[in-house]
Amino acid sequence: KGIREIIRQFPDTQLILLDDAFQHRYVKPKVNVMLMDYSRPVYDDSLLPYGRLRESAHQVNRADMVVVTKCPAGLSPLSFRLISKKLGLMPYQKLYYTSYSYGSLMPVFPEDSPYHADLAALTARDSVMLVTGIANPRGFVRHFRSFPFKVVVNHFPDHHDFTRSDIEELKNKFLTLKGERKVIVTTEKDAVRLAYNPYFPSSLKQFVFYIPVSVRMVAETEDNDLAGDLMKILG
């Protein structure tokens, strides 16, 4: 219904991208791209409610392209081969690997933040309080634990709207956190929710940062031109 409405309103539309539509059989896409989190491979998961899958892992065979996301740095060639073997893809299916590249800390409240935070400058005497409201924060947390400073994690459910009590709890935790220097760091998604949260105290705004994330192809693998291959299929 939504696709028909798009075509009706915008008849010149040439491309429609759907998110999380793999299980909708009424839609017959020209290309199916399936994303698989490196830390939660489908071959080690189960159907709901026992696991997280909405479909059998065998449905991977319907994908034209499979992208393994959030790969940690330094994966060995053997690791890539094991993933490929366990997926058991058909010859017509393409397999890609991507990883996150983390940028420098950015203030969530730039007008209230004269304070500059640099992760590389923080030491074991400093503390970082993480605030996440995403489905799988493992990679995010792993990045910060690679530094010498103390890391305290506050994880909320995916798409969480922070309540007054949530904010009050975070404030109290931050105020009692030990460290010569201390900051609050959140994800880009959660930064938007915090920036417009009416309960966030002005006294903490200068200490709140988010870390930009970009996605890059893992160059060490045979197939690393996803965009080019996709354009070939689409014609």
Indicate residue ranges for each PLM-predicted region.
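Short, conserved loop/helix-junction motifs that constitute active-site signature segments
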Residues: 27-28, 57-62, 88-91, 120-124, ...
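A short, acidic, amphipathic alpha-helical segment used as a generic capping/interface helix at domain edges
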Residues: 162-182, 191-192
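Short, charged, surface-exposed secondary-structure boundary motifs
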Residues: 43-52, 106-109, 161-165, 216-227
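Beta-strand-loop-alpha "switch" segments that mediate conformational coupling across diverse proteins
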Residues: 95-106
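Redox- and metal-dependent alpha/beta enzyme cores, enriched for Fe-S-associated oxidoreductases
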Residues: 110-111, 123-164, 229-231
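Phosphate/Mg2+-binding loops and adjacent switch elements
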Residues: 1-91, 97
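Short, flexible loop segments at boundaries between secondary-structure elements
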Residues: 101-103, 157-161, 203-234
